[in-house]
Amino acid sequence: MIGRQLIQLLQHRHHELISVRHDKHPGEFKQISNRAGNTVFVRPDLVRGTLEQAYALYESLARGIKRSIFMMFVISEIHPFDDGNGRIARIMMNAELVSAQECRIIIPTVYRDDYLLALRHLSRSRNPDAYIKMLVRAQEFTASIDFSSYEKALQQLRQANAFMQSFEGKLIF
């Protein structure tokens, strides 16, 4: 898929994700710079070009986990929208996995701090090891859950502490 088509798909999925939040401009790239703490994301006027450059690299990667990990980071790092950037990054990541018939990745509540710290570490250090390890562990966790019934999945998620805050417990599986 060429960069332009992938950008259109990203915008379409974002529109679907937050379509009821008109004030957040569903499917439209940001017009005002955004930040999280000390992290300043890509300037609005550079979003499209940065995505196009990133997608050129994306196409060189093998389908599946490699592309999904890259996709997740690119969208998280660019933060192309006013809102919903983390959610759309995870949607795009999982779409890559599904298209390669690989297990999706769920980031349970208890693992959220690990997830954010690994993203921040990669952004600041340019060392992807912790980020890759975190996502592989999350995928292994997701694969360990039996989703054949709601009751089974819910029980396993509770046993794994998935719904706890990180200060209340750790992910167990």
Residue ranges and their predicted role:
Residues 1-173:
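FIC/Doc superfamily catalytic core
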